[in-house]
Amino acid sequence: MKYYIVAGEASGDLHASNLIRSIARKDSRAEFRCFGGDLMKAAGGTLVRHYRDLAYMGFWPVISHLGTILSGARMCFDDICEWAPDAVILVDYPGFNLSIAQKVHKKGIPVYYYISPKIWAWKSWRIRKIRRYVDEMFSILPFETDYFSRHNYKVRYVGNPTVDEISKYLSDTKRPQVLTDDGRRIVALLAGSRRQEISRNLPTMLEALEGIDCIRPVLACAPGIEPEFYDSIIGGKEIEKVYGGTYGVLEKAYAALVTSGTATLETALFGVPQVVCYRLPVSWGVKLIRKLLLRVRFISLVNLVSFSEVVPELVAGDMNAVDVREHLMPLLSDTQERRMQLDGYDQMKDLLGPAGAPDRAAEMIIFLLEQRTRQ
């Protein structure tokens, strides 16, 4: 069968590449054509256009490049129509992908969505497009099944691919050791993946660590961010930097300061107690917008999956060096706070379930397509 896959950022490229491999193992005649990235190409997809050509984040960058984004969407749709796939698989990236879903669905091509848009947090009105134009949704967060059910749409939870990535990493007996032990307890710093995010969060993280004895701060640097950018923020502070080795840092870490996102989940799956830190441009307006528009109690995936505050979250004006330090200190020794986080991680892992997310998604997609051909 012919599968057209669309992913719009680095994480989507990774998850889509694993899905391609899973489908290929189960469908020996599978062909793949992609709007995506290098990993999808390496997995066997014919790359039509790279996601970086359309990767604009934030209100003004999107508005100023709207023409490029719209022309990219038209090109994607035209290419889909010309290639005539048996299915279109969309991976996250909802702003772009839901517009593709709308057009493709009208052509009678089945649309499958792997990694649900996070409409439970933001832009819940997108459920209308999902109900109309997405044939099947495959979720990677267990609580999403209840959320979508309340909105009269059934999603299938397939497991979380981060579990797969970490299981694969830990099972590699030849994995490189990026850090050697020197007796000090490593505090991992995961300050975000984008420059704006890093510049807002890293200075406060570094300030919070000043004067704490017997720790070894290690910064896990994001891919695509040049060393000079980090150096401009760190200044003269002696902070170890590791490039391309976040899992290697987490494997050795005793505690961590982490911005929100998948990094919080990765940190928990490695069993590293953490403080979630996320600074926004501080103003009463931002706080008001957050209260009015964000529909969730928590920002970290650990707490969202667990339905409780397993890890402390310091957000916006609450994210300051004093409070970060206050929440970090109990995690640096064998305390009740540390043990409670680790117990919470165990419960979260049970909720996420075992590895195998891309395999389960692939099996369902192939089964659904076979059902269609028999009708």
Positions of PLM-derived features:
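Nucleotide-activated sugar donor-binding and catalytic core shared by glycosyltransferases
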Residues: 1-375
